[in-house]
Amino acid sequence: MEERGRETQMPVARYGGPFIMVRLFGQDGEANIQEERLYELLSDPRSALGLDPGPLIAENLLLVALRGTNNDPRPQRQERARELALVGILLGNGEQGEHLGTESALEASGNNYVYAYGPDWMARPSTWSAEIQQFLRLLGATYVLRVEMGRQFGFEVHRSRPSFRQFQAINHLVLFDNALRKYDSGQVAAGFQRALLVAGPETADTRPDLRKLNEWVFGGRAAGGRQLADELKIVSALRDTYSGHLVLQPTETLDTWKVLSRDTRTAHSLEHGFIHAAGTIQANCPQLFMRRQHPGLFPFVNAIASSLGWYYQTATGPGADARAAARRQQAFQTRAAAECHAKSGVPVVAGFYRTINATLKGGEGLQPTMFNGELGAIKHQALDTVRYDYGHYLIMLGPFQPWSGLTAPPCPYAESSWAQAAVQTALELFSALYPAPCISGYARPPGPSAVIEHLGSLVPKGGLLLFLSHLPDDVKDGLGEMGPARATGPGMQQFVSSYFLNPACSNVFITVRQRGEKINGRTVLQALGRACDMAGCQHYVLGSTVPLGGLNFVNDLASPVSTAEMMDDFSPFFTVEFPPIQEEGASSPVPLDVDESMDISPSYELPWLSLESCLTSILSHPTVGSKEHLVRHTDRVSGGRVAQQPGVGPLDLPLADYAFVAHSQVWTRPGGAPPLPYRTWDRMTEKLLVSAKPGGENVKVSGTVITLGEQGYKVSLDLREGTRLAMAEALLNAACAPILDPEDVLLTLHLHLDPRRADNSAVMEAMTAASDYARGLGVKLTFGSASCPETGSSASNFMTVVASVSAPGEFSGPLITPVLQKTGSLLIAVRCGDGKIQGGSLFEQLFSDVATTPRAPEALSLKNLFRAVQQLVKSGIVLSGHDISDGGLVTCLVEMALAGQRGVTITMPVASDYLPEMFAEHPGLVFEVEERSVGEVLQTLRSMNMYPAVLGRVGEQGPDQMFEVQHGPETVLRQSLRLLLGTWSSFASEQYECLRPDRINRSMHVSDYGYNEALAVSPLTGKNLSPRRLVTEPDPRCQVAVLCAPGTRGHESLLAAFTNAGCLCRRVFFREVRDNTFLDKYVGLAIGGVHGARDSALAGRATVALINRFPALRDAILKFLNRPDTFSVALGELGVQVLAGLGAVGSTDNPPAPGVEVNVQRSPLILAPNASGMFESRWLNISIPATTSSVMLRGLRGCVLPCWVQGSCLGLQFTNLGMPYVLQNAHQIACHFHSNGTDAWRFAMNYPRNPTEQGNIAGLCSRDGRHLALLCDPSLCTDFWQWEHIPPAFGHPTGCSPWTLMFQAAHLWSLRHGRPSE
């Protein structure tokens, strides 16, 4: 989609009115990675570009365009100054210090060179700019036209000033080859683009190849009307759509939280519902593409987990600079997608990363391609829709932000997670406010598409009547600015087509039927409007469905038509026809540029290769190497449902074979017994909660198992066999997962190929083979999506099939992962192959110049292997396990050793040729069993015609333990785990060179992560580290409000934590609070969740300002905070900023009284950005001081415990530098970032154990201890199954984790110190 935004038919009008451009400079800026690289180049005397410069000085540069001139009347100038000050406050300016000021640290002179740059003011605003503009709009600002954050750097030049060659280096390194622009003085004097408008291409059929491929797979003219996917599916689909077949998996334990605070006294219930897995593969894919596609299948789907995968050409080139440029592009593209998902409130639980050399078949023509899968939960009643008909309303949800350069590094125009979060919340609220069928249309095209294509997908018959006054504001403003000569039918049609219909965008489109009756006192449109208002989601009622074909526009700009009048008869001012679908005759695919013949014999010389050198090349390859630069920098656990995310073991290494997402995190009593009466809490104390003996029955957790399988290179070699191998990998990844019934496994295939290089018969053959294979495996099969390279790109040989597994699962004990568990245990391997090098293997790619044909194992042998291992897992014999895939057997063994940090000794038979054995990628498994169980395991496997091999023994634990491979009497490999980990992590280190500052990459502490084994316990808990799971009815005397700010998601973990602690917990949205007595019935207030804005610090300060803007909301919260019988807790970045901004924590003063305005500028602290400059998702040690005043942490005083810490700004920076000492003396420090030791003084001071390296304080409380704000989020780990790794000190716990005590303590405190009422 990159080219769509660059094709323009008519230039968008620049803002030409009077304006003032203000420049503000960051006072505490430091050089970013690109500026550091440039300076190193220019200061290197050996470089041809050397300038002998002085010290590098860099700073942020904020440009603000304000409406008006200096000659405006004084009231206007004062209001303009107030709004400019508001921008500074939102970006960190305070009364005691300014982060942005009018004085620059740089001065341009004869010897100084100063360079300013940033987003292009002549193009659409950046995503960051659009989001701050949205905040300003919510806060009532009218004078701020546009805000952009740029950069400025400079240095003294001792010799000649920069020449053309130096400017080329600046353009490449700093401007990303003109993705950003150099700022010259007076550059925007003639005007700038204010509107979020991008012209789209004027094409009759924008995606003919994509349409053709979907017709092949899912039926249509090209396939003779046959529904091939329907014929081959193994399960009965609910219905067929252009986007694929929909297969739902039922569940009876779906968490449902009441939306409105006035709902019944039971705010939570477990309901029947469905789980649906969806996905797609797209070249240059929009970061959040699947988040919009899923509502196109089920409009009220709630995304609960996602998965990401990437395909790239191997970073090659004629020189080091070309390779570095390719690596940088890949690093920024993947980072942009990871951070967009990190801000969406939906955890990423699975993924992959594959590179293919351009010289290999499959690498030629490969564009950056992303897979995005999503797991959604759907309430049973949310499946009901109404029949499409005329007279239905057309709705567009979300701000209109056309795509332009979404994936072009450094990705300033990446998608807005805020917009997508608001849309999802709005739909969720809409389904609750109007619980009756009303949506009649919601289908979407199968790929990134123009608005006109989306509208065409919604309309099965007739057309649409659209009203110009109801179009998005930027489009409407552009129409209003057209002069009389252009404001004609053809002129307006051209403008609307260019800037509304032809661009691709991120909006969700639906049609709704306006029912005659009201529900809950509201009509459909009133309920939708209320839902969008509460969610902070922009929405547009564009028009209605009509019998007249095409898009018929009514010019009502002078006299806008109301929504009630849209059903009247109107004459169109102009009409735009839907793009005609071109009929194409049969054509043969373009001949391939490479030899089609496949050699069946390898061309490498094995005697010249050593195991050690081959293993080094394999482990450092991007396909096999660590993906920590992705996994640790995106959201993994938001919402609290994730029982298994990618990280495993004491080092949190991304090696998990499968993910497990729970359907509910709310406790129930064993055996379905009813909950205890809430009066049970009257007899309870913290001591009783920790002293009770754990029950004998383990708690069962129900959910969905998710795995991925893909073999992109092997699919390119042989579509049929590669597809089967992808299915085999996905299935074996789930072999050690706690699946309830193997027959419930659902395989969903997502196909990506170029129709110009393959024909219908090849696709049909591959799909038929996949269907036959699934039958042989005994699993269900469906086809999810079909995609192809972008239109206009060169033909590509790259083909891939991503197979995803989803299956109902349940566990009650530790999950089986690749983490080796026990010294002295044995490792057993079972493979479906002959031990020879697999065609298309990574070994073959690296060491052979001939590609051989891959071969998938027989379905029966794979089925037997899967079911046998499942049987062994359920019997409790298997201690750990890992699948054999990319890199072969030796890679699997190394990864298991690294995951468990245990030495391994492998013995290969003397008669065997060990090198092919080690690197063969035939599907199989390695699992760990105790020596006493080996006989039983071997007998079980052999009884099913499998031939297992005992490979070796597990050694002691420790980073200096050895990984050995013995071939008879000869030791052919012996390396320490520390050295192997460095090799395996080398690819991630290369990526970090592009993503993190040099001072972090070169820090001696950068690898000091994990090993959170040594725990300190409090006098209260003693050695009993597993508190009691007390399941009671919700206590109406302890009602807790979870405050949901606009643009936030992921509150479920807070709701569940307080519900499990016996509280009656409800969500409260800002716009619900209409008087200052609203919170009087509550004794607890919780603030958390994930805000979708790219700038976390900005989002927090803007949220406080938004609270202050609504007096009823502000006074209700301040009244609550000042009541002596209440408590509050704020978790994560947003929560800490809100509670500190309201004056509850961060100082020794009390919060302001109701009626007093909250001054955001007086906040005692601001959040410090992470030292890495990246989003962090870390499992870190947190210590609670023994003297803290916090009432919620009373039971954990003196503890050192691991906890999830996620965010972009995970440090506290106080405006008063002496405040930390004041708070410490007042016992208002709630917790610290801690090292891996137990001593109370061993705080973490360095990244990554201390994400920002700005002090070590991770939490604060109020002077009386009632209010608590933590940067970590204990609600994400109240149960042990939510923990990344359970240290041995806990043994095999059956209760809940110690973090539960803080929520239970809040309940007990409210009963003893509050004024609880029924």
From Swiss-Prot:
Protein's job: Tegument protein that plays a role in the inhibition of host intrinsic defenses to promote viral early gene activation. Interacts with host DAXX and thereby disrupts the complex between DAXX and ATRX. Suppresses the DAXX-ATRX dependent deposition of histone H3.3 on viral chromatin allowing viral transcription. Targets also host SMC5/6 for proteasomal degradation in a CUL7 and calpain-dependent manner to support nuclear membrane-less replication compartment formation and lytic virus replication.
GO molecular function: phosphoribosylformylglycinamidine synthase activity
InterPro entries from the UniProt entry: Class_I_gatase-like (IPR029062), Herpes_virus_tegument (IPR010077), PurM-like_C_dom (IPR010918), PurM-like_C_sf (IPR036676), PurM-like_N_sf (IPR036921), Tegument_herpes_virus_N (IPR024346)
Domain of life where this protein originates: Viruses
Entry's Gene Ontology cellular component terms: host cell; host cell nucleus; viral tegument
Main location: virion
SUPFAM superfamilies: Class I glutamine amidotransferase-like, PurM C-terminal domain-like, PurM N-terminal domain-like
Family: Belongs to the herpesviridae MTP family.
Localization terms from the record: Virion tegument; Host nucleus
Assembly description: Interacts with host DAXX; this interaction disrupts the chromatin remodeling complex ATRX:DAXX and thus allows viral transcription. Interacts with host SMC6; this interaction targets SMC5-SMC6 complex for proteasomal degradation.
SMART domains per record: GATase_5 (SM01211)
PANTHER family: PHOSPHORIBOSYLFORMYLGLYCINAMIDINE SYNTHASE
Gene3D superfamilies, alphabetized: 3.40.50.880, PurM-like C-terminal domain, PurM-like, N-terminal domain
Gene Ontology BP annotations: intracellular transport of virus; purine nucleotide biosynthetic process
Source organism: Epstein-Barr virus (strain B95-8)
Protein name, per record: Major tegument protein
